[in-house]
Amino acid sequence: MNFELTEEQTLIRDAARQFARAEIQPVAAQCDRDAHFPLELMAKARDVGLVNVTVPEAYGGSGLGVFELALVTQELAWACAGINGTLSLNSVVADVFHVAGSAQQKASVFKRLAEGQFGAYALTEPAAGSDVSAIKTRAVRRGDTYVLNGGKMWISNATLAEF
């Protein structure tokens, strides 16, 4: 069994490493001090294929897998875990729709992510933390719609998200 990175994976890792050192590391400490996310970094990272890593190419994403996302995340987080969290979250949002979205939902969400919109991720609950087996929020079908009942906290990308 070969555990070496493929040539494509090496290029992806190296691009993420170079971006992290050139673009993220120089601003990371100031962003932490100011509790500020540099939106211009999102556009730059998207332009070089480091955002929306798991969004299919047909919708404007990189069309890569979770292993390649892990390579990108590792390099970006080296420079700043906070900035990486925001940059990589769109792939987490995309993965939810890969697994459970209808074709119509996938088309809508993937397109919006690829256009530069931010998605949010609501997992943590007051009584459950991030233990998915203890989550109480439920979606109940009522006719043609779903009614959500429950409470969430610490929503990832909540201040930036457009959906």
Pin down the residues of each PLM region:
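Intrinsic disorder at enzyme termini
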Residues: M1-E8, A139
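Glycine-rich flavin
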Residues: Q25-F163
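Alpha-helical bundle segments that constitute or directly flank the non-heme di-iron/ferroxidase center
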Residues: A15
